[in-house]
Amino acid sequence: MTRVWRFLFLAALAIPVNVLAAPVSVHNLRLWQAPDNTRLVFDLSGPLEHRLSTLNDPERVVIEMEGARLKDGLASLDVSHSYISAVRAAEKSDGTLRITLELRRPVRPKSFVLRPAGQYGHRLVIDLYDEVIARASPSPTPRAAPPARQVMAPNDLVVAIDAGHGGEDPGAIGRRYRTREKDVTLAIARELYKLVAATPGMKPVMIRDGDYYVGLRKRIEKASGNDAEIFVSIHADAVPGRQAHGSSVYALSLRGASSEQVRVLADKENAADLIGGADIGEVDSMTHKVLVDMIQTATIGDSMVLGADVLASLRGIGSLHHVKVQQAGFMVLKSPKIPSILVETAFISNPDEERKLRDRNYQRSIAESILKGLKRAMPRLIARRGGETLQAVVPTPTPSPVSPALQSAQAAPVSTAREHIVKPGETLSAIARLYDMHVETLRFLNGIQGNDLAVGARLQIPARSSEL
């Protein structure tokens, strides 16, 4: 009897561990197509080990998952608009699930796993990057600093428009109509893109223009790579209950949030990478340098002023949830040099506001309000650009063309040292009207909390705040 047990024990040791363990179920497969890559996401019942390899003639990518079993077939997967021509699956005798992707073109594959987050459990993510695009894209070369005593003639002001969430990350879901935040933000972003494109002196850049996910750090990199001077991230808020309503504007804070509610919102938005799918190995490698750079510049202050202009414009189409620009540690706003704001357009958790967010006319109204705020801030942003590059007034031999709108804005005084001395009987609102600026902007620039003004107080006034 002892010999029998010994034989069974030794036989058990010879069996691979992945055969003894309960197989991990691969129970769903989704595909997202971005401009430069195809993303495949496998839903898993638990964690697993996997291997990734490529084969040529014809081009294929092979994914091997140890101790896995395909629960559902692959026939329903639509690959017609992706880099993949067909998907095949086979289960090997050792318990390994082999997925073969037949390709339309050469790709550079990359894989990573995601732990449970939001509505998702364990996931395996496969990104297929276009090999042709990757080879054609040269490595970025450092820009030479402008020679001393040279004036840099400005071009159009580049506005980066970021539609929040996307792809795997639907964002908040409306209660009544099941509206997805990612769809609403993309619709508003596209409306804003058209309006900015039609505005003299401005040029729009879309961070995402389809139903795919872009990592939070990648959004910043894309804005910077396109020389953006404004970054606007569009969202639709959600909270428990149905009563919360109104728009809000947020800027970055390095020292905590404006309130506990704002901190919770920032935590929720920052979790987008966990839900949408970003390789954590690529995130935050430059965080320390970024924060140091931001402290050395006035980017956060510029963001607050920009936010106040946009917030005041949003007041014209509905109520405000916060009457002042709020601050928290939003990852997507951590650009070292680009004034950046996050606009929560409305509460998708409020049935009435959810209905409005689905309406194209309302989407356009929101976009128009954001544009109005951007136009109000435009002269100061042009002045900010000049302050960064202007070293001496010496004409360049062949200046670049400048749009009429920017010529007008550039002609305005660039000094921000103007002061207003408060006279008896003057109020904040009266002074704001005098200089064609918003009260909130005046409050922020001068650190004013209430409405009381001391006679003789010196208030800082922006160089120019009028509408274009």
Q: Language-model segments: which ranges?
A:
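N-terminal signal peptide c-region/cleavage motif recognized by signal peptidases
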Residues: 14-17
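Bacterial N-terminal signal peptides that target proteins for export
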Residues: 1-9
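Signal-peptide-cleaved, periplasmic/extracellular N-terminal interaction regions immediately downstream
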Residues: 20-159, 421, 430-433, 461, ...
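Active-site-adjacent mobile loop/cap segments within catalytic or ligand-binding domains
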Residues: 52, 63, 126, 240, ...
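Intrinsically disordered, low-complexity mixed-charge segments
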Residues: 133, 377-413
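Extracellular LysM carbohydrate-binding repeats and other cell-envelope/extracellular binding modules
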Residues: 418-421, 430-433, 437-468
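Catalytic-core regions of hydrolytic enzymes
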Residues: 135-285, 296-300, 304-308, 364, ...
